[in-house]
Amino acid sequence: ITMHTWYEQAVFYHIYPLGLLGAEKTNTLTETAHRLRDLEAWIPHIRALNGSAIYIGPLFESSTHGYDTRDFRLVDRRLGTNEDFAHFVQLCHENGIRVVVDGVFNHTGREFFAFQDIREKREASPYKDWYRGVNFGWGSPLGDPFGYEAWQGHFELPCLNLWNPDVRQYLFDSIRFWVDNFDIDGIRLDCANVLDFGFMKELREKTSAMK
């Protein structure tokens, strides 16, 4: 008998929440907009299509399109709160739908805490090895007082150093946070074609033990 994992047989429905819910293109909100609550009405529609899983993302606090992450453990204020998303996942599970989120692990936004610390403290920053190609001998085209490797030359997306054990642990802890607080069922890897294979192998080992 051939055993299949649930995702091999699932019918996925893809949601890009910032677009579907009409969020502002730039995150300048001072208050939270509870747009995720509007997604709850989509659950019966997805079930009617025989959907058994939702791939949703990016979800977490970012400056613009969702892939320039500010905070891996906070739902984007343009979408709602952590509690809003946890409730959405709960409703999905009650309707037999699993939830997979976007894992944006190749890079962050420039407003991410580690990047901001390097901007402020330069060589004295404990996070100076969290990004690839950090060079204090030149500045970025965006005015940062150091250079760094950026995803496909987009300097608003500085590349994380996934060979750094501290970076890996931070990301693994963030995933544990998602499992504990949202009860997610899986992760889609953004930019998987450029992720370090060793990181992905360890990621698989760590997450298999989480749920």
Can you annotate each of these PLM segments?
Residues 1-211:
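Active-site and adjacent substrate-binding regions of carbohydrate-active enzymes
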